Amino acid sequence: YSQYALVAAEQAVKDSGVDLEKIDRDMVGVIWGSGIGGLETFYQEVKSYVEGGFIPRYSPFFIPKMIADLAAGHISMKYGFRGPNFCTVSACSSSNHAMIDSLNYIRWGKADMILTGGSEAAINPPGVGGFNSMQALSTRNDDPQHASRPFDKDRDGFVIGEGAGALILEEYEHAKARGAKIYCEVVGGGASADAYHFTAPHPEGKGAMKAMRDAIKDAGIAPEDIDYVNVHGTSTPAGDIPELKAVAGVLGDHVYNVNISSTKSMTGHLLGAAGAVEALACIFALTHGVVPPTINCENRDPETVSYTH
Protein backbone atom coordinates (compact mmCIF):
# COMPACT_ATOMS: atom_id res chain seq x y z
CA TYR A 1 0.00 0.00 0.00
CA SER A 2 2.86 2.41 0.66
CA GLN A 3 4.31 1.73 -2.79
CA TYR A 4 0.98 2.56 -4.39
CA ALA A 5 0.91 5.70 -2.25
CA LEU A 6 4.36 6.87 -3.35
CA VAL A 7 3.58 6.39 -7.04
CA ALA A 8 0.24 8.21 -6.82
CA ALA A 9 1.83 11.01 -4.78
CA GLU A 10 4.56 11.45 -7.38
CA GLN A 11 1.96 11.74 -10.12
CA ALA A 12 0.00 14.32 -8.11
CA VAL A 13 3.07 16.45 -7.33
CA LYS A 14 4.12 16.39 -10.98
CA ASP A 15 0.62 17.25 -12.21
CA SER A 16 0.36 20.15 -9.74
CA GLY A 17 3.33 21.92 -11.29
CA VAL A 18 4.48 23.04 -7.84
CA ASP A 19 8.10 24.20 -7.52
CA LEU A 20 9.18 22.58 -4.27
CA GLU A 21 12.05 25.04 -3.91
CA LYS A 22 9.68 28.01 -3.87
CA ILE A 23 7.18 26.89 -1.22
CA ASP A 24 7.36 26.78 2.57
CA ARG A 25 7.47 23.04 3.20
CA ASP A 26 6.69 23.63 6.86
CA MET A 27 3.21 24.54 5.59
CA VAL A 28 2.75 21.47 3.41
CA GLY A 29 1.26 18.35 5.00
CA VAL A 30 0.37 14.78 4.12
CA ILE A 31 -2.89 13.29 5.36
CA TRP A 32 -3.44 9.81 3.97
CA GLY A 33 -6.08 7.12 4.32
CA SER A 34 -5.78 3.34 4.46
CA GLY A 35 -8.28 0.93 5.89
CA ILE A 36 -5.86 -1.94 6.51
CA GLY A 37 -2.30 -0.72 5.90
CA GLY A 38 0.46 -3.23 5.36
CA LEU A 39 -1.60 -6.42 5.27
CA GLU A 40 0.79 -8.11 2.83
CA THR A 41 3.70 -7.36 5.18
CA PHE A 42 1.75 -8.75 8.12
CA TYR A 43 0.94 -11.92 6.19
CA GLN A 44 4.48 -12.52 4.96
CA GLU A 45 6.07 -11.81 8.34
CA VAL A 46 3.75 -14.11 10.28
CA LYS A 47 4.21 -16.81 7.65
CA SER A 48 7.98 -16.42 7.87
CA TYR A 49 7.86 -16.58 11.67
CA VAL A 50 5.74 -19.73 11.71
CA GLU A 51 8.01 -21.41 9.16
CA GLY A 52 11.17 -19.96 10.69
CA GLY A 53 12.62 -23.16 12.07
CA PHE A 54 14.75 -23.32 15.21
CA ILE A 55 15.03 -19.58 15.85
CA PRO A 56 11.96 -17.86 14.41
CA ARG A 57 12.12 -14.06 14.35
CA TYR A 58 10.35 -11.05 12.94
CA SER A 59 12.09 -8.56 10.69
CA PRO A 60 12.99 -5.23 12.33
CA PHE A 61 11.02 -3.66 9.47
CA PHE A 62 7.84 -5.58 10.34
CA ILE A 63 6.17 -2.85 12.41
CA PRO A 64 7.35 0.14 10.32
CA LYS A 65 6.14 -1.50 7.10
CA MET A 66 2.83 -2.68 8.56
CA ILE A 67 1.38 0.35 10.33
CA ALA A 68 -1.01 2.41 8.24
CA ASP A 69 0.58 5.81 8.81
CA LEU A 70 3.88 4.91 7.15
CA ALA A 71 2.51 5.84 3.72
CA ALA A 72 2.12 9.44 4.88
CA GLY A 73 5.56 9.24 6.44
CA HIS A 74 7.21 7.96 3.27
CA ILE A 75 5.63 10.73 1.20
CA SER A 76 6.70 13.44 3.63
CA MET A 77 10.26 12.12 3.76
CA LYS A 78 10.51 11.97 -0.03
CA TYR A 79 9.44 15.59 -0.50
CA GLY A 80 10.42 17.18 2.81
CA PHE A 81 6.85 18.11 3.72
CA ARG A 82 6.93 19.03 7.42
CA GLY A 83 3.31 20.07 7.95
CA PRO A 84 0.50 17.97 9.49
CA ASN A 85 1.19 14.29 8.87
CA PHE A 86 -1.00 11.35 9.80
CA CYS A 87 -3.18 8.55 8.46
CA THR A 88 -6.92 8.19 8.85
CA VAL A 89 -8.06 4.61 9.44
CA SER A 90 -11.82 4.26 9.12
CA ALA A 91 -12.37 1.26 6.85
CA CYS A 92 -13.85 2.21 3.48
CA SER A 93 -14.21 5.87 4.51
CA SER A 94 -10.50 6.29 5.28
CA SER A 95 -9.51 8.49 2.36
CA ASN A 96 -12.78 10.44 2.56
CA HIS A 97 -11.88 11.38 6.11
CA ALA A 98 -8.33 12.20 5.00
CA MET A 99 -9.69 14.67 2.46
CA ILE A 100 -12.08 16.26 4.97
CA ASP A 101 -9.28 16.63 7.52
CA SER A 102 -7.07 18.17 4.83
CA LEU A 103 -9.78 20.68 3.95
CA ASN A 104 -10.16 21.68 7.58
CA TYR A 105 -6.44 21.99 8.30
CA ILE A 106 -6.19 24.42 5.39
CA ARG A 107 -9.26 26.31 6.60
CA TRP A 108 -7.72 26.59 10.06
CA GLY A 109 -4.56 28.11 8.60
CA LYS A 110 -2.42 25.15 9.67
CA ALA A 111 -1.28 24.39 6.11
CA ASP A 112 -1.13 26.02 2.69
CA MET A 113 -1.15 22.72 0.84
CA ILE A 114 -1.84 19.11 1.77
CA LEU A 115 -1.17 16.02 -0.30
CA THR A 116 -4.04 13.71 0.52
CA GLY A 117 -5.66 10.53 -0.71
CA GLY A 118 -5.50 6.86 0.12
CA SER A 119 -4.06 3.51 -0.86
CA GLU A 120 -4.82 -0.14 -0.25
CA ALA A 121 -3.28 -3.50 -1.11
CA ALA A 122 -5.45 -6.31 0.22
CA ILE A 123 -5.42 -8.83 -2.62
CA ASN A 124 -3.63 -11.52 -0.65
CA PRO A 125 -4.69 -14.62 1.32
CA PRO A 126 -5.80 -12.85 4.53
CA GLY A 127 -7.52 -10.02 2.66
CA VAL A 128 -9.44 -12.21 0.25
CA GLY A 129 -9.94 -14.97 2.80
CA GLY A 130 -11.21 -12.62 5.48
CA PHE A 131 -13.74 -10.87 3.29
CA ASN A 132 -14.77 -14.20 1.79
CA SER A 133 -15.47 -15.60 5.26
CA MET A 134 -17.72 -12.60 5.86
CA GLN A 135 -19.58 -13.54 2.64
CA ALA A 136 -18.89 -10.03 1.38
CA LEU A 137 -17.27 -11.00 -1.94
CA SER A 138 -18.88 -11.89 -5.24
CA THR A 139 -18.66 -15.58 -6.13
CA ARG A 140 -19.11 -14.94 -9.84
CA ASN A 141 -15.72 -16.55 -10.48
CA ASP A 142 -16.80 -17.94 -13.86
CA ASP A 143 -17.48 -14.40 -15.13
CA PRO A 144 -15.20 -12.04 -13.20
CA GLN A 145 -15.47 -9.08 -15.58
CA HIS A 146 -19.19 -8.88 -14.80
CA ALA A 147 -18.93 -9.67 -11.08
CA SER A 148 -19.05 -6.07 -9.85
CA ARG A 149 -22.61 -5.05 -10.69
CA PRO A 150 -23.98 -2.40 -8.31
CA PHE A 151 -27.78 -2.08 -8.22
CA ASP A 152 -28.26 -5.16 -10.40
CA LYS A 153 -30.78 -7.63 -9.01
CA ASP A 154 -28.21 -10.44 -9.35
CA ARG A 155 -25.40 -8.67 -7.45
CA ASP A 156 -23.83 -10.97 -4.88
CA GLY A 157 -20.91 -9.09 -3.33
CA PHE A 158 -18.00 -6.82 -4.11
CA VAL A 159 -14.75 -7.38 -5.99
CA ILE A 160 -11.57 -6.29 -4.22
CA GLY A 161 -9.54 -3.64 -6.00
CA GLU A 162 -6.03 -2.38 -5.27
CA GLY A 163 -4.34 0.94 -5.87
CA ALA A 164 -4.18 4.54 -4.76
CA GLY A 165 -5.57 7.98 -5.46
CA ALA A 166 -3.71 11.18 -4.59
CA LEU A 167 -4.88 14.78 -4.68
CA ILE A 168 -3.29 18.07 -3.73
CA LEU A 169 -5.58 20.38 -1.77
CA GLU A 170 -4.33 23.95 -1.67
CA GLU A 171 -5.48 27.23 -0.17
CA TYR A 172 -7.10 29.14 -3.02
CA GLU A 173 -5.05 32.34 -2.91
CA HIS A 174 -1.85 30.31 -2.51
CA ALA A 175 -2.76 28.27 -5.59
CA LYS A 176 -3.62 31.37 -7.64
CA ALA A 177 -0.39 33.10 -6.64
CA ARG A 178 1.74 30.32 -8.06
CA GLY A 179 -0.38 29.91 -11.19
CA ALA A 180 -1.62 26.45 -10.28
CA LYS A 181 -3.79 24.39 -12.59
CA ILE A 182 -7.02 24.26 -10.57
CA TYR A 183 -9.39 21.40 -11.36
CA CYS A 184 -12.13 22.20 -8.88
CA GLU A 185 -12.94 23.71 -5.50
CA VAL A 186 -13.55 21.53 -2.45
CA VAL A 187 -16.42 23.24 -0.68
CA GLY A 188 -17.49 20.97 2.17
CA GLY A 189 -17.50 17.64 3.91
CA GLY A 190 -19.56 15.67 6.38
CA ALA A 191 -18.88 12.73 8.69
CA SER A 192 -21.15 10.45 10.68
CA ALA A 193 -21.76 6.94 11.98
CA ASP A 194 -24.68 4.54 11.61
CA ALA A 195 -24.18 3.32 15.20
CA TYR A 196 -25.95 0.19 14.03
CA HIS A 197 -23.80 -2.85 13.15
CA PHE A 198 -20.10 -3.59 12.65
CA THR A 199 -20.46 -4.56 8.97
CA ALA A 200 -24.02 -3.88 7.76
CA PRO A 201 -25.27 -0.36 7.03
CA HIS A 202 -28.35 1.05 8.70
CA PRO A 203 -31.27 -0.24 6.59
CA GLU A 204 -32.65 3.29 6.18
CA GLY A 205 -29.24 4.87 5.55
CA LYS A 206 -29.42 7.18 8.56
CA GLY A 207 -25.67 7.71 8.96
CA ALA A 208 -25.19 8.32 5.25
CA MET A 209 -27.99 10.89 5.26
CA LYS A 210 -26.38 12.78 8.12
CA ALA A 211 -22.98 12.85 6.39
CA MET A 212 -24.47 14.16 3.14
CA ARG A 213 -26.61 16.77 4.89
CA ASP A 214 -23.62 17.97 6.89
CA ALA A 215 -21.53 18.19 3.70
CA ILE A 216 -24.22 20.23 1.94
CA LYS A 217 -24.53 22.56 4.95
CA ASP A 218 -20.76 22.92 5.23
CA ALA A 219 -20.55 23.78 1.53
CA GLY A 220 -23.26 26.41 1.78
CA ILE A 221 -25.21 24.97 -1.13
CA ALA A 222 -28.71 23.57 -1.62
CA PRO A 223 -29.58 19.99 -2.59
CA GLU A 224 -30.92 21.38 -5.88
CA ASP A 225 -27.39 22.52 -6.80
CA ILE A 226 -26.26 18.88 -7.08
CA ASP A 227 -26.45 17.13 -10.44
CA TYR A 228 -24.20 14.09 -9.93
CA VAL A 229 -23.70 11.70 -7.01
CA ASN A 230 -20.89 9.15 -7.07
CA VAL A 231 -22.28 6.58 -4.66
CA HIS A 232 -20.39 4.00 -2.60
CA GLY A 233 -22.25 1.28 -4.53
CA THR A 234 -20.22 -1.79 -3.60
CA SER A 235 -22.49 -4.34 -5.30
CA THR A 236 -23.50 -6.04 -2.06
CA PRO A 237 -27.09 -7.19 -1.45
CA ALA A 238 -27.15 -5.43 1.93
CA GLY A 239 -25.49 -2.14 1.01
CA ASP A 240 -26.79 -0.74 -2.26
CA ILE A 241 -30.45 -0.12 -1.40
CA PRO A 242 -29.91 1.68 1.96
CA GLU A 243 -27.50 4.00 0.19
CA LEU A 244 -30.07 4.94 -2.45
CA LYS A 245 -32.61 5.48 0.33
CA ALA A 246 -30.14 7.90 1.91
CA VAL A 247 -29.53 9.80 -1.33
CA ALA A 248 -33.28 10.07 -1.94
CA GLY A 249 -33.84 11.14 1.66
CA VAL A 250 -31.38 14.01 1.29
CA LEU A 251 -32.29 15.18 -2.21
CA GLY A 252 -36.06 14.66 -2.04
CA ASP A 253 -37.86 14.98 -5.37
CA HIS A 254 -34.70 16.48 -6.88
CA VAL A 255 -33.22 12.97 -6.84
CA TYR A 256 -35.05 12.31 -10.13
CA ASN A 257 -33.00 15.07 -11.79
CA VAL A 258 -29.65 13.77 -10.57
CA ASN A 259 -27.16 11.46 -12.26
CA ILE A 260 -26.14 8.62 -9.93
CA SER A 261 -23.47 6.01 -10.63
CA SER A 262 -21.00 3.67 -8.97
CA THR A 263 -17.52 3.60 -10.46
CA LYS A 264 -16.79 0.50 -8.35
CA SER A 265 -18.47 -1.36 -11.17
CA MET A 266 -15.25 -0.63 -13.10
CA THR A 267 -12.54 -0.40 -10.43
CA GLY A 268 -13.75 -2.89 -7.85
CA HIS A 269 -13.74 -1.83 -4.21
CA LEU A 270 -10.45 -0.21 -3.24
CA LEU A 271 -11.45 -0.24 0.44
CA GLY A 272 -9.65 2.63 2.21
CA ALA A 273 -8.53 4.12 -1.12
CA ALA A 274 -12.03 4.14 -2.61
CA GLY A 275 -12.95 7.67 -1.57
CA ALA A 276 -9.85 9.24 -3.11
CA VAL A 277 -10.13 7.32 -6.37
CA GLU A 278 -13.81 8.19 -6.63
CA ALA A 279 -13.10 11.85 -5.83
CA LEU A 280 -10.80 11.82 -8.85
CA ALA A 281 -13.60 10.28 -10.92
CA CYS A 282 -15.88 13.15 -9.86
CA ILE A 283 -13.21 15.77 -10.62
CA PHE A 284 -12.68 14.43 -14.11
CA ALA A 285 -16.43 14.14 -14.62
CA LEU A 286 -16.55 17.90 -13.99
CA THR A 287 -13.47 18.54 -16.12
CA HIS A 288 -14.70 16.61 -19.15
CA GLY A 289 -18.46 16.99 -18.71
CA VAL A 290 -18.99 13.23 -18.79
CA VAL A 291 -20.82 11.21 -16.15
CA PRO A 292 -19.12 7.87 -15.39
CA PRO A 293 -21.40 4.88 -15.96
CA THR A 294 -22.40 1.99 -13.75
CA ILE A 295 -21.40 -0.92 -15.93
CA ASN A 296 -22.85 -4.44 -15.56
CA CYS A 297 -26.20 -3.19 -14.25
CA GLU A 298 -28.08 -5.31 -16.75
CA ASN A 299 -31.14 -6.26 -14.70
CA ARG A 300 -31.81 -3.38 -12.38
CA ASP A 301 -33.04 -4.30 -8.92
CA PRO A 302 -36.73 -3.29 -8.91
CA GLU A 303 -36.32 -1.84 -5.41
CA THR A 304 -33.97 0.84 -6.73
CA VAL A 305 -36.77 2.27 -8.86
CA SER A 306 -38.55 3.41 -5.69
CA TYR A 307 -35.75 5.87 -4.96
CA THR A 308 -34.29 6.95 -8.32
CA HIS A 309 -34.92 6.87 -12.04
Language-model segment annotations:
Residues V50-F61, K78-T88, Q145-K153, S192-A193, ...:
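Glycine/charged-rich beta-loop-alpha catalytic/anionic-binding loops adjacent to active sites
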Residues Y1-S90, S119-V128, D225-G239:
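Conserved beta-ketoacyl condensing-enzyme motif
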Residues A9, V30, I75, S95, ...:
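Conserved small-residue
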Residues D142-A219, Y228, T294-C297:
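Condensing-enzyme catalytic core mediating Claisen C-C bond formation in acyl metabolism
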